[in-house]
């Protein structure tokens, strides 16, 4: 029996060695047929002696039964996200913040790595054996994907070597190389199956299969980049040395990892990786920069759910070339006419793009764009596609000039362009069906009147059937009328009537926001409501009085005066006043509130992770803050969440105090 055990152990050791050479180092020493022979030999021995099968045997990677659902996993150490920077100026600002917090002037050493475009996972090893794998989820709770991760041959089921901690949680990214992605999609096309839009989606979809046997067939791989939980052992106090320790244990680590001293070396690494990006064989969307010293990392700490000692330096949006087939003109809520290019579909940054905004007539003129042109399309911020250039030497002879309409394409009203403004607008107001629809959608939206169940499709039908012309008409609807709409039964109709009834009780700030006055967002509406307290006072205010309100300048003041002075709007507001009520806003006297926010003009920027933006606004306002939507010299405080952008940069330029979300939460707690 001892010889059988020895033979099995030798086969397992040999197979693990060759798996590591093939899947991690990409340097196989034996042909596939020999690997298959060794695997088959092990399978036969284990079949004869099932009592000798162990969880970490190479034979146990594939074949677990399908799951009904993934169980939830609580991360013992939260899986934090990273803040982003998008240009060198923003990176230098990050570098300065790190130096300032450490009170250091000398160049710091950073560990620079690739920012892989895959799925973040956590691998928990106990006494060297992989016992659990989980997705990031929301950072606190993820999904148990152990059975699927065990099928990824790049991930060792047992760590090799010495000094392995009793419990260690390795973190990294599961991704799909481009060659495997293309092969997977080619096979799907042949079989008429689902084609994935990009390797990231393919990796995520493969990893979250309830049947591990499907995951096993997908060409997934893995690179590790950090550690979470660590118990019963020690790791080096340098991030890059930790990565080298992982590598010694048999874990895959990217070769493109480099120590850089000072910002110049970091930027040089970023530029080189950006240049080499196309030849890597897998998708990345930037580089990750981390302070290498663990001692310094601990000094720097964390902001809400991101470390202060690291940032993701993202690449610019990817670009592709395609052709403009047509240009159409859309009408927005305020009558803005927006030209939209209809494109020959093209994949940009992993998404099929067939439309792109052209913004306005000035942009069309600047580009020199014609219908039929070959253009460069960029996904701005990897979200909104836009045309950024024309390939003039590919212009066809029959390319047509783009004529901006003189009349609204929806209602036929005149289009006007106010001097000094780039945007042309339909003058039809609520006579225009397009504006009517968008105005009504805004009126019932969540942060306005919040009419539950009143979706876009319902609004469109109400306008098309001429049941509703303005917001006041919504409150004249009956269940009988609503049941005449598509997919609207008696119960749904009655629920909508109840929701409309509930919406009659609101706040003055929500009401003002719901009216859709140009450039009056939530923050401005709240400031107007707090300052004037009722409609009568607001109607009586002139431009100078309005300009005394935080967040209200000359332009916004004119919009408010013009809106309230327009006869049609007056009639709609009078009709709404008969059915909608709100308590007069409580007058907050800053001097009487013991709060660091009292009397301060505060701007929120970036993504908040602990409170929602709405909750943060409400709590700040309750403590006497005036929440503004833009940064100016009048701003007292900026609260910066994750991925804070231009507002944060402007605040730093103006020398305005900036705090993070964690500090805001602390101050809110002290004030309550």
UniProtKB/Swiss-Prot annotation:
Gene Ontology annotations of biological process type: DNA repair; DNA replication
Q: Which residues form the active site?
A: 115 (n6-amp-lysine intermediate)
BRCT domain boundaries? 592-672
Q: One GO cellular component from the entry?
A: cytosol
- Which transformation does this protein catalyse, written as a reaction? NAD(+) + (deoxyribonucleotide)n-3'-hydroxyl + 5'-phospho-(deoxyribonucleotide)m = (deoxyribonucleotide)n+m + AMP + beta-nicotinamide D-nucleotide
Tell me one Pfam family matched here.
DNA_ligase_OB
What does the record give as EC number? Answer: 6.5.1.2
Cofactor(s) it depends on:
Mg(2+); Mn(2+)
Binding-site positions, Zn(2+): 408, 411, 426, 432
Q: Which domain of life is it from?
A: Bacteria
Please list the GO terms describing molecular function: DNA binding; DNA ligase (NAD+) activity; metal ion binding
Report keywords, A-Z. Answer: DNA damage, DNA repair, DNA replication, Ligase, Magnesium, Manganese, Metal-binding, NAD, Zinc
Residues that bind NAD(+): 32-36, 81-82, 113, 136, 173, 290, 314
Q: Which family does it belong to?
A: Belongs to the NAD-dependent DNA ligase family. LigA subfamily.
Annotated function: DNA ligase that catalyzes the formation of phosphodiester linkages between 5'-phosphoryl and 3'-hydroxyl groups in double-stranded DNA using NAD as a coenzyme and as the energy source for the reaction. It is essential for DNA replication and repair of damaged DNA.
Instruction: List the protein's name.
Output: DNA ligase
């Amino acid at each position: 029996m001892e010889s059988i055990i020895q033979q099995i152990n030798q086969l397992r050791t040999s197979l693990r060695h060759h798996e590591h050479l093939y899947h991690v180092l990409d340097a196989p020493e034996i042909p596939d047929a020999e690997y298959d022979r060794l695997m088959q030999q092990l399978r036969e021995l284990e079949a004869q002696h099932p009592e000798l099968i162990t969880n970490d045997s190479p034979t146990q990677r594939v074949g677990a039964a399908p799951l009904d659902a993934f169980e939830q996993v609580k991360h013992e150490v939260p899986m934090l996200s990273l803040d982003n920077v998008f240009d060198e100026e923003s990176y230098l600002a990050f570098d300065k913040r790190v130096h300032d917090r450490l009170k250091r002037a000398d160049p710091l050493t950073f560990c620079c790595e690739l920012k892989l475009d895959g799925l973040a996972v956590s691998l928990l090893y106990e006494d060297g054996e992989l016992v659990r794998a989980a997705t990031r989820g929301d950072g606190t709770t993820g999904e148990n994907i152990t059975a699927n991760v065990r099928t990824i041959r790049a991930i060792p089921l047992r760590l090799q070597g010495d000094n392995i901690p009793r419990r260690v949680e390795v973190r990294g990214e599961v991704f799909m190389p481009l060659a495997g992605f293309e092969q997977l999609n080619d096979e799907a096309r042949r079989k008429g199956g689902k084609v994935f839009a990009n390797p990231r989606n393919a990796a995520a979809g493969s990893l979250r299969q309830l049947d591990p046997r499907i995951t096993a067939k997908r060409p997934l791989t893995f690179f590790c980049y950090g550690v979470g939980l660590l118990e019963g052992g020690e790791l080096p106090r340098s991030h890059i040395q930790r990565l080298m320790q992982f590598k010694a244990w048999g874990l895959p680590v990217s070769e493109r990892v480099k120590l850089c001293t000072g910002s110049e070396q970091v930027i040089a690494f970023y530029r080189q990786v950006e240049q080499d990006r196309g030849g890597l064989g897998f998708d990345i969307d930037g580089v990750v920069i981390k302070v290498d010293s663990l001692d310094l990392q601990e000094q720097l700490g964390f902001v809400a759910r991101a470390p202060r000692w690291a940032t993701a330096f993202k690449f610019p949006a990817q670009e592709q070339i395609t052709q403009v087939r047509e240009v159409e003109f859309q009408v927005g809520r305020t009558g803005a006419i927006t030209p939209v290019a209809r494109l020959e579909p093209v994949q940009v940054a992993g998404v099929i793009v067939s439309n792109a905004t052209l913004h306005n007539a000035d942009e069309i003129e600047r580009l020199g764009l014609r219908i039929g042109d070959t253009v460069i399309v960029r996904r701005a911020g990897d979200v909104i596609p836009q045309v950024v250039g024309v390939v003039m030497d590919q212009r066809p002879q029959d390319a047509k000039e783009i004529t901006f309409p003189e009349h609204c394409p929806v209602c036929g009203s005149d289009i006007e362009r106010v001097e000094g403004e780039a945007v042309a607008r339909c003058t039809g107001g609520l006579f225009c069906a397009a504006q009517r629809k968008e105005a009504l959608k805004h009126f019932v939206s969540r942060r306005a009147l919040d009419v539950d169940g009143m979706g876009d499709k319902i609004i469109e039908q109400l306008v098309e059937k001429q049941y509703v012309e303005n917001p006041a008409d919504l409150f004249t609807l009956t269940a009988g009328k609503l049941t005449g709409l598509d997919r609207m039964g008696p119960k749904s109709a009655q629920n909508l009537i109840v929701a409309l009834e509930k919406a009659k009780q609101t706040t003055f700030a929500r009401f003002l926001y719901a009216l859709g006055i140009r450039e009056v967002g939530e923050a401005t509406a709240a400031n107007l409501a707090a300052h004037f307290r009722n409609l009568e006072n607001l109607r009586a205010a002139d431009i100078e009085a309005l300009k005394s309100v935080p967040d209200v300048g000359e332009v916004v003041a004119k919009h408010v005066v013009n809106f309230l002075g327009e006869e049609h709007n007056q009639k709609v507001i009078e009709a709404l006043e008969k059915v909608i009520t709100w308590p007069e806003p409580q007058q907050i006297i800053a001097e009487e509130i013991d709060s660091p926010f009292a009397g301060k003009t505060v701007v929120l920027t970036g993504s908040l992770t602990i409170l929602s933006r709405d909750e943060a606004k409400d709590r700040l306002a309750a403590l006497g803050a005036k929440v503004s939507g833009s940064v100016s010299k009048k701003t007292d405080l900026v609260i910066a969440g994750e991925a804070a952008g231009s507002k944060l940069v402007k605040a730093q330029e103006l020398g305005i105090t900036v705090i993070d979300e964690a500090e805001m939460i602390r101050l809110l707690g002290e004030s309550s």
